[in-house]
Amino acid sequence: MKKFNLLPIFAISALFGLTLTACDKTPQVQASAPVTSTMAVGGAPTSVAPIPPSSSASLIGSGVAATQTLPLSQPVKRVVADVSATFIYDPSVGDKIVVTADDNIQNQVKVSLEQGVLKLAPMAATMQQKTPIQITWGGAAPEQLDIMGSSKVIVRQFKGNALNATISGSGAIDVDGQTQQLNIDISGSGSFVGAQLVAQKAMIKVTGSGNIVAQVKQEVGGSLTGSGSVVISGNPKIRNLTSTGSAQAVYQ
């Protein structure tokens, strides 16, 4: 039997131009950083930025207030407040919408006005405001106010045939002005303050621990269930408020 001379492994590697690494080392693969494209209105990419490391990361407000002015393209007939913010109607503002927020949160505040409905797009629960978000607008007064959660709506110098207010949660509404018909429906611990709103007639419904202060001149009716309270001024001639539980109505 013939004997073959084996070339050393290093000689073979040199012969074929191979590069060997130690067997006990694991090859290291460097992953490229993920990117995301930020789209402007209309779909054009405006910048490329790294994806945040975690969706649970908090965005903390800077404490520096900034304002943004938007055109009021149509009258606001209804306000849907389901985001933690304050909505203020003030006719002296004119035909525009003014958004106030922390300067580093301003671009997260998305105002929507479609078919007369004004609202804010949902925001991340991890966002921490230092400057309360405030939406102020003018033009015609809204006729429907719908609040969910802890939002607040302020209406100044209301003038209209009817004002409808619905509060679900711990939100608050503050109104002054005058109206023929006032309709209020509260479920939860919300509050309606209308001591400076002169209403000729009012229909009230409270379920839970909500509170109402209203001024009614002619007629007030409705029902109170739970532990809520209603204070009525204006000395209405017709009083048809009924209550169950510990709820009470007080006339001043």
Question: What residues fall within each predicted segment?
Answer:
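Intrinsically disordered, low-complexity terminal regions
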Residues: K2-Q252
